[in-house]
Design a protein with these regions (language model features):
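Beta/alpha (TIM)-barrel catalytic core signal, keyed to glycine-rich beta->alpha loops juxtaposed to Asp/Glu
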Residues: 3-7, 38, 147-328
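CE4/NodB-like, metal-dependent polysaccharide N-deacetylase domain
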Residues: 122-142, 164-168, 265
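A short acidic, glycine-rich active-site loop
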Residues: 108-121, 246-253
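N-terminal binding-site loop/beta-alpha segment at the start of enzyme catalytic domains
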Residues: 1-84, 93
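N-terminal small/glycine-rich loop or linker at the start of catalytic domains
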Residues: 12-30, 88-114, 143
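Distinct, well-ordered alpha-helical segments
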Residues: 66-75, 97-99, 127, 131, ...
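Short, well-ordered coil/turn segments that N-cap beta-strands
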Residues: 16-20, 50-52, 79-83, 136-140, ...
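Short, acidic/polar
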Residues: 33-46, 119-133, 179-186
């Protein structure tokens, strides 16, 4: 079994990623305010416990996630040995005179608004501004973010810009951050990606990625990072009022999550531990991305990720009809 701080080499790029990685939307105050002292402690906890792979984006906190991550990472004297930094392009942050509070990110400055921009200038501007917010001189991995409505621009405009920046050494790897398997496959068929961050499509509730995307990624030697392993909450605590894909979960989804949880409980296995470890069942998956709001949550996720599970647990869930059979 993998441990949270175990490193694995990327298939195409000379980078080592820890099996458990840290997403930074929660530390930027996703849905609920987070004090900067909490975010500092969280990032230091990740580093002090051997995690090296950090994912961020201009969207998260409208620049706040990158700024908070940069407070800690920017002070490290040997960054290449300490962390792998992944951010995203496809949106720029514009200042507006009149603005309403941001419901998703209450800590964000409401005058700073994200706008999709897949133009060549927009991609360059996004990266330049990310470098400044992060306080670093290079990005390890740049992902095209939420390109489902910008597929042509991602393929024909953004990717060539990123490929050129990769040749210049400003970035080391190019990928996409996406929620849709079909979009990921279409982009992969047209450009030479190094990595895909896929949210919510290879979890205990949704194994749709294994039908086509994960086998294709193996064939193309493209690394896969799986995010959204709790499907935004229902797999962490499947009770009425839980969320699935950031919306109220249906009774059917809650019942399915409860059934999986009850089956695992009879075996003495926490649902959260199984949810965190499940994606690594597929050989295409390199890392599991978890978002944490504070160091307590992160330490709990590390413990769940490191918990030893029975070798046949996934087969047992298959036999019980609770997950799909593995498809390679």
């Amino acid at each position: 079994m993998a441990r949270h701080n175990q490193k694995i080499g990327m298939k195409r790029i000379d980078l080592q990623l820890t099996r458990l990685s840290l997403g930074t939307a929660p530390l930027a105050g996703l849905f609920k305010s987070v004090d900067i002292s909490e975010s500092d402690e969280l990032i230091n906890t990740a580093l002090n416990n051997g995690m090296n792979y950090f994912d961020t984006a201009p969207l998260y906190g409208h620049g706040l996630a990158e700024e908070r991550l940069g407070r800690i990472l920017g002070s490290i004297t040997q960054p290449s040995k300490s962390y792998v930094l992944q951010t995203k392009v496809g949106r720029v942050l514009n200042w507006v005179e009149k603005a309403d509070p941001v419901p998703w990110f209450p800590d964000a400055d409401p005058h700073i608004q994200p706008v999709f921009d897949y133009s060549a200038d927009g991609i360059k501007r996004s990266l330049d501004e990310s470098l400044k917010r992060l306080g670093v001189d290079h990005i390890d991995i740049a992902l095209m973010h939420d390109a489902e409505n910008h597929i042509s621009e991602a393929i024909n405009i953004a990717y060539p810009v990123l490929a050129d920046l990769k040749r210049q050494g400003i970035i080391k790897a190019v990928g996409i951050g996406i929620n849709f398997c079909d979009v990921a496959i279409e982009i992969m068929k047209n450009v030479d990606l190094d990595i895909v961050l896929l949210a919510g499509r290879y979890t205990l509730l949704d194994q749709s990625a294994q039908k086509k995307l994960l086998p294709y990624a193996l064939e193309r030697k493209v690394d896969i990072t799986i995010g959204g392993v709790f499907n935004s909450g229902v797999l962490a605590d499947p009770k009425p009022g839980a969320t699935f894909e950031y919306l109220p979960a249906s009774d059917e989804i809650i019942k399915k999550a409860q059934d999986i949880g009850a089956f695992l409980k009879n075996l003495g296995i926490p649902l959260t531990a199984a949810a965190l470890q499940f994606p690594l069942r597929h050989p295409a998956v390199t890392s599991v991305l978890t978002g944490s709001r504070n160091s307590k949550e992160l330490l709990a996720n590390m413990a769940d990720f490191d918990l030893e599970l029975p070798e046949d647990i996934w087969n047992q869930l298959e036999d019980a009809g609770l997950i799909e059979k593995l498809s390679l």
